[in-house]
Curated annotation (Swiss-Prot):
Annotated region (Disordered), positions in chain: 223-265
Molecular function in Gene Ontology: RNA binding
Biased composition (Basic and acidic residues): 224-249
Subcellular location: Host cytoplasm, Host cytoskeleton; Host cell junction, Host plasmodesma
Xref: Pfam families: MP
Full protein name: Movement protein
Organism: Youcai mosaic virus
GO biological process, one term: transport of virus in host, cell to cell
Family that this chain belongs to: Belongs to the tobamovirus movement protein family.
Assigned GO CC terms: host cell cytoplasm; host cell plasmodesma; host cytoskeleton
Keywords assigned: Host cell junction, Host cytoplasm, Host cytoskeleton, RNA-binding, Transport, Viral movement protein
Protein role: Transports viral genome to neighboring plant cells directly through plasmosdesmata, without any budding. The movement protein allows efficient cell to cell propagation, by bypassing the host cell wall barrier. Forms a ribonucleoprotein complex with viral RNA. Binds microtubules and modulates microtubule stability. Can bind double-stranded DNA.
Length: 265
């Protein structure tokens, strides 16, 4: 039983991806690999599997496996007892519990079985060329001599290749701007910067009260702002406006409408 997958079974295109050219969307191309048949000869086996056959990798940076369909055909009579467990593994991960992408169990009496996995994650093209995926097949309670082939597996995958996998970054937000004007792009950049947690944390930290002279004071209160505070009362000393006591002296007054400094004795 051969399976001919449909892209729509694994991937739902947005309206933008359907209308816009490939260069303007994250989706670049979708390829269906040729089938790969695995003949199971032992009760337990672990073998590499190429999920990216005929997928063009050289022109892209990342590849994602959107879906994998396994079709199994038992090569024994349907009254035979026993079953099989098929697991797909990402061999890059060392933890045995975390490396399993998906597992399926089927009984020999079912004769044929089929299941679909949706890994839905990307790997770099450099990693993909090293074939990071494996299939672990374990036949249980099937009384058959060693060396015979009781099971055949056909594997078909749907993959997507792209040069950009960051979907929430500034680049994607800028591309999404419909009106190509400076103000629109500046607004997107400002909104993105304001949304980053690190910027918020720094801004909040700077606004906190600082300790001066052993007590909490607002540092903004003592910042020199001549245009706002210079005036008739500038020469009058007030204890609450100073950090230290000084004798009265001439104070330079800056006026923005004149453009130069004046001294009032």
């Amino acid at each position: 039983m051969s399976y001919e997958p449909k892209v729509s079974d694994f991937l739902a295109l947005t309206k933008k991806e359907e209308i816009l050219p490939k260069a303007l969307t994250r989706l670049k191309t979708v390829s269906i690999s040729t089938k790969d048949v695995i003949s199971v000869k032992e009760s337990e086996s672990l073998c590499d599997i190429d999920l990216l056959v005929n997928v063009p990798l050289d022109k892209y940076r990342y590849v994602g496996v959107l879906g994998v369909v396994f079709t199994g055909e038992w090569l024994v009579p349907d009254f035979v007892k026993g079953g099989v467990t098929v697991s797909v593994i990402d061999k890059r991960l060392e933890n045995s519990k975390e490396c399993i992408i998906g597992t399926y169990r089927a009984a020999a009496k079912d004769r044929r079985f089929q299941f679909k996995l949706v890994p839905n994650y990307f790997v770099s093209v450099a990693d993909a060329k090293r074939k990071p995926w494996q299939v672990h097949v374990r036949i249980q309670n099937l009384k058959i001599e060693a060396g015979w082939q009781p099971l055949a597996l056909e594997v078909v995958s749907v993959a997507m290749v792209t040069n950009n996998v960051v979907v929430k970054g500034l680049r994607e937000k800028v591309i999404a701007v419909n009106d190509p004007n400076v103000e629109g792009f500046e607004g997107v950049v400002d909104d993105f910067v304001d949304s980053v947690a690190a910027f918020k944390a720094i801004d909040s930290f700077r606004k906190k009260k600082k300790r001066i002279g052993g007590r909490d004071v607002n540092s903004n209160k003592y910042r020199y702002r001549p245009e706002r505070y210079a005036g008739p009362d500038s020469l009058q000393y007030k204890e609450e406006n100073g950090l230290q006591h000084h004798e009265l002296e001439s104070v330079p007054v800056f006026r923005s409408d004149v453009g130069r400094a004046h001294s009032d004795a």
